[in-house]
Amino acid sequence: MDYESIATPEACYVDFCLLPVSKQLPAHASAGLGVRRWADTDIEQIGTGNVSVAEDIAEVQRVLKASGLKYTLHSAGTTVEGSWDEVMAAVGKAHAAVHRRGVVRIQSSMRVGSRTDKMQTAEDKVKRLESLLASQSE
């Protein structure tokens, strides 16, 4: 198979959560408590020197707004919809924007979905579930 000729999916959605991991190496890292472990446990202990990452997430939202893509902020991250290339470019730009704010290490967790049988938005998926729940409660 010629893998170079494989096109990316026409449309996709991605849920991602960008975590600014550290602006500088935290003092506890030198005490043998590796930064990676802290980054994986609790957002309050991720080493940015500030328990709030709201300003960094606000910057991500500004990047997404400028992208023109459909996106939805939720409590655990953001859902972004568009072509594969557009969505991945937007996530990359979000990383770059947060790096420009002085964050030297960023980790994003992403869950990506794509369909080839029909067009379906994240909103369509939610509406379908709400419809099922409403019909079951009657």
Language-model features, listed with the residues they occupy:
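Charge-rich, low-complexity N-terminal segments
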Residues: M1-E138
